[in-house]
Each structure stands twice: as C-alpha cells, then as structure tokens.
Amino acid sequence: PQALWIDSPPSPVSQLDVTALMIEHDLGDTAHLLECAARLSSQQWTAPIRPGQTVLDWGGAEPSVGAVLGAIVWSKQVWLATIAGDDFPARASTQSADAVALAAFHVDVGKHWRTTVSEYSAAGRLGDTVIDALCETPESFPLYGIVAHVLTYSAHRRELARTMLAEHGIDAGLGDPLDWMRS
C-alpha cells in the first residue's frame, strides 16, 4: 500500500479545532522566526533587502526582516482593534529596534489574539459580522473571515521572512505545521 489509515478511537471530547491548531502554529512559528531574527545585527534587521515589497496596500512597504515580522504582529493588533471597536493601533508599537523587543510584544498580542478567537469560537459566534469603521470606507467582515485573513497573510509573511533571513545566512527551517506538531 501507498499509505495506511489509522482510525482514532471515538472520543466524547470534541475533535481538535483546526482553527485553534493553525493559530497556535502561527504564533509558535512567528516566535521561532523572531528568535532566529534575534541573531541579526541592527543593520540587518532594518536592511531594505526587498525595496518596495508590499503585502497589503493598507499596510505599507515591508522591505526588511523587521518590517515583515512587525507587520505580522501589527496586523493582529489591527484586527483585535476592529473586533473590540477600538481605535486604529499605532504602527510604532511593532517597529521595534530589534527582534527581542518585538518578540516580547508578540507574546502579549498573541495571547490576546488566541483568547479573543477562542472565546468567540466557544460561544459559537465566529459567524458574527463586524462593521469595520477603521476602514476608509467602512466595510463588514465575518469573524471567521477575519481569522482566515490573518492566518493567510501571516503565513505569507512568515515565508517572506524565512527567505529574507536566508539571505542573511540564517536557516529558519520550513515552518511546516507537521514538523511543529512533532516538536
């Protein structure tokens, strides 16, 4: 056979929440990349090795390792503010002088993100819609769409960061969730 299937025993506990798994992987992999980036000099952290690189128009340019990793953290802040109805967060909080400072901030933002999504999920409210007044023209987004958006663009940015770190001579691994689950 080319593969074997092993059934899991029936469980009275609900099956593993794939969204929660992806959020944990996102936070863990981002922490790993920040740990790798801590080996960069301050010049390498801010070096514009991809001038003009823009992931999302509203997010601005992300030409350096620091800018890309900062955008991963900042985007969670933006969406947390949207969900809570808070003011648009200043980008300065994620434009840290180094990876160590950003990593510490990431821990706090990550906890808030994990808790927020978990609470809405447990309450069965991921289908709720948020009218985002932070957008230039207010838009509406279902919460599950916000989570999908954050995870999608975070994954994209993590791969950009991996490539950029490699250009600085740092191997950050593949970021494969299967490898992460084994560690």
Feature map (PLM): residue ranges:
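Short, contiguous alpha-helical
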Residues: 1-7, 16, 20-40, 44-92, ...
